[in-house]
């Protein structure tokens, strides 16, 4: 985390730098939001599809030990807020799991089941994350988030494990519908 000052205002900036990750369909140019009316700096960054793939892969690997509540919120927010091409998301998930030498799940990962999200410990972690992260707006409970992530990610994973193309598109908030954009 970097701390900068604009006058007397303290500004925190966090930058994650990754090496060796596979970015699908490729690096994306992003406009970094500005506080004042200056031109937005252009940065190279991950695609939303790669972000989802990496966070989902962590959910699969970490299993019950997962404490990364931000990953749940991030995937849910992305699925709620933008459309996705099924083939592109499938490519990103497949490439990330291959690169990280992780088998694709053949059944629902524990992180997306009641065995995970209904435990008091996970409920406490979720509430603490929302409070500490100062998450704004109405955010569902972890069980609802997990159910929506399941509806978003698992049809793609099912196609990958079956060796089939996933020729669907996602509208913001879902569900998947047949056809490509």
Regions found by a protein language model. Give the residues of each.
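Structured mid-to-C-terminal alpha-helical surface segments
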Residues: 1-181
């Amino acid at each position: 985390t970097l701390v900068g000052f604009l006058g007397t205002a303290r500004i925190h900036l966090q930058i994650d730098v990754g090496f060796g990750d596979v970015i699908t369909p490729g690096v994306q140019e992003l406009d970094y939001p500005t506080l004042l009316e200056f031109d937005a700096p252009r940065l190279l960054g991950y695609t939303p599809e790669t972000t989802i793939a990496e966070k989902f892969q962590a959910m699969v690997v970490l299993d019950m030990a997962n404490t990364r509540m931000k990953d749940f919120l991030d995937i849910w927010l992305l699925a709620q807020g933008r459309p996705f091409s099924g083939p592109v998301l499938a490519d990103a998930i497949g490439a990330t799991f291959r690169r990280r030498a992780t088998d694709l799940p053949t059944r629902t990962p524990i992180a997306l089941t009641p065995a995970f999200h209904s435990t008091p410990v996970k409920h406490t972690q979720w509430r603490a994350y929302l409070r500490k992260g100062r998450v704004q707006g109405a955010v569902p409970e972890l069980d609802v988030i997990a159910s929506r992530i399941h509806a978003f990610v698992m049809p793609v994973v099912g196609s990958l494990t079956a060796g089939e193309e996933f020729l669907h598109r996602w509208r913001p908030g879902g569900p998947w519908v047949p056809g490509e954009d």
